[in-house]
Structures are given as C-alpha cells and as structure tokens.
Amino acid sequence: MALRPEKPVWMSQEQYDRQYGKLEEPKPPREESKPGDQAKPSAEPKSGSEEKTEGSSSSTGQGEERPHFKIQKRRHQNYDLEERKKKQQLNKLREEQLKQHDIEMAANKVVNVDQIVREHYNERTFHAKRYNRNYSPIIKLRNFNNAIKYMLIDKYTRPRDVVLELGCGKGGDLRKYGACEISQFIGIDISNESIREAQRRYLNMRDLDYQVILITGDCFGESLGVAVQPFPECRFPCDVVSTQFCLHYAFETEEKARRAILNVSKSLKVGGFFFGTIPDAEFIRYKLNKFSKEVERPSWGNSIYKVVFANNSYQLNDYEFETPYGNMYTYWLEDAIDNVPEYVIPFETLRNLCDEYGMELEMQKPFNKFFVEEIPQWMNKFSPRLREGLQRSDGKYGVEGDEKEAASYFYTVFAFRKVKDYVENAPAHA
C-alpha cells in the first residue's frame, strides 16, 4: 500500500492531492448473506469494466477492500527534478561566493591569482567536453578571434620554425601552425586539465606532421627552465614565441611581468618574433574615464561580457593608474570566462620591458583595425565554414552587436622582434 506523506501546513489540499494523488473513498463492506435475504431481488449486473476494476482491487481477506491511491508519478518526478535544480543552484551560489572570496583575497594580495586561474581553466576544460562548440552563444566572437589568430600567426611564422606558445590552453592553435608547416611546437600551460585535453586533441589530428611537446608549468611566475628541463627534445632557442589571451595574468606584479618577458627573451632567437593578443589598455582607460570618483567599483559590459574593477583608485588618482602593475579587474565572458581576475597591461610598460630585454616593437593594432587591414587577402584562404562564421547580418565580415565591443574593441594585437640577446648584470667584483 502506498503511503502519502503528511501534508505541510503551507500546502493547500488541492496542491497536495495534485502532487501525491487523491485518496479514493473506500467502498462499504459487503454484507454477509442471510437466509431471509435470499428472496430479495438481486442487484443489476456490473458492467465488464466495473468488474475488471473491482477484481483488480486488493482485499483484506475479511471482505473489506483496501483503499488505493492514484499516484501521479510524472508530477512526483517533476517535484524531484525541481528539488535537484534547487540544490544545484544552491551549490553554484556557494561556489560563486567562495570564488568571490578568493578574488577579494587576490585583490588584497593575500593569495596568488595563479590558483584561481588554474582552477577556472581546469573547470572550463571539463565543461567544454560536454557540449558542442557550434551551439555556443558566442560562436561569432570565437570565429572572429580565430580569424585574428590565423592572420597573426601566418604573418610572423615561417616553414620549419620552432614555436613556443606560453599559455597554450587546450591546443586550439595546433592546426593554425600546421598550415605554416612548422617543425616543432612547444606548448606550456598552468592548467593540467587543459594540457591533457590538448594532448587528446593532438592524438586525434593525424594530419599534423610536426613534433608537439605539451608541458604543464608556470609560464610567468618562474623560470621556464623548471618546466622544460624534463623535456630535452625541446629545441631552444625558438623562432617564434606566442602568448594568446593570457599575458595579462603576468601583470599582477612587476616581478612577475619581468619574469614573463625575460622568459620570452631567453627562449627566442635573435631575429625571431614575439607576438600575441592582450586587452587594450587604451580602451579600458576610455571606459574608466566615464566614471566619477564617487563610484567605488567601476564596471561596464553587455549581454556578452562584463568588466568590474576592484576599486576606484584610477579615478582617485586623477584618472591615472598609480602603478603599471596590479590593476585588477574581474572579467566575465558568456560561455567562456567566469569572473576571473585579470590585470591591465599599459602598452608603454610592455614596450619598455621588451626593449630592456632586447626586443623592438614591430606592430601594435586594435583587433578591429588589424582585421580590416588583413581580411582582404585572407578571404580565399579561410575555409568556407570560417568565412560563413565571419559573415554579419549585413553581408559584410566581422562581428556585430554586443559581441563587437567584447572582441573588436577590447583587445589588441602586438608583435616584437628580438634584436639582441639580454645579458644580465654581472655581480660586481671586489
């Protein structure tokens, strides 16, 4: 016999019956036949359906039928589903609160941002395996970013080059380098899950004919020698060093930024190129200049992305950054980045560091300008699928709507050429 739980006080009887089924009224017990009753006319015969229903009822064995309930399983399952959704939402809220706590700790220099970044990209790698990229709400933005990287990589990479990519992620650029016919690719990333996924992708790319070495390691916080020492097959110095959408993590401190650029310089041949994609500090300043000094945490964005600064120190310092390093904001990008701490890269600071470590500026342009200048010669090189993915609603190529600000305006491309080896100051002799 199915039992119904006790009705909560906040639930109406109608809701309760709808959720757990309505209790049928029990039928009166059959009266035993008596000798004097035999003369009474018999009742009308039951219909076949009524007989079937009665026959299916369970009996107590004493002539009394048990009551039974119409349990509405589908509604009960819906109730369980709602409960699971509530628990998932609660767990997600707790995770976001913990993450926000970590971000605040990073802003106050209590914890290193590397841990937050590593955990984020490990988690994103896990979720990325479970859905089709083509259904992403930012598929146009992803196509645009891929086109930018195709053009940038092709511009500075030559056949038989040895390539080092710092922050290689899940290996999304392996095919781009394959088109350049390089001889070796060395990819390093702080996320062990991203490296594992990059290895899986590489094994499925049977048409790549160059050597691929994938390493888990810290590209910015320590010497690259620590990460690459177990891999003697790496052919240093390299012809190309690339950093795509990750160098901003190095500008947490001056020490970290210097270590990152020193790693680049030491890994690169004289005449080789260092190129990449970074947030455009001028666009960020343009946005920050719109806020008054009373706004404690300046923020802006749209349905695709959002930027939130940890404080209003820029405004309070007469609309200038107090220091080139440690200017933190959290960045959210739909279906890609979940409020991860990033740091402003004042481009003149990057240029000065590169100059100090033996590299001269070759090119720096916002995404939109670089795309407009390079796209005419690329339309016949892109695959039909990518060309279709770049087409806007007006028939032109690029990004539009909310995606335009998040991609075309927020980022810039750069390239430096190494002109001399950096020689560290030798210790003074007594």
From Swiss-Prot:
CDD domains cross-referenced by the UniProt entry: AdoMet_MTases (cd02440)
Basic and acidic residues composition bias: residue spans: 15-37
Entry binding sites for mRNA: N145, N146
Reaction it catalyzes: a 5'-end (5'-triphosphoguanosine)-ribonucleoside in mRNA + S-adenosyl-L-methionine = a 5'-end (N(7)-methyl 5'-triphosphoguanosine)-ribonucleoside in mRNA + S-adenosyl-L-homocysteine
Positions annotated to bind S-adenosyl-L-methionine: K149, G167, D189, D218, Q244, Y249
Keyword Transit peptide: no
A GO cellular component annotation in the UniProt record: nucleus
Function description: Responsible for methylating the 5'-cap structure of mRNAs.
Designated name of the protein: mRNA cap guanine-N(7) methyltransferase
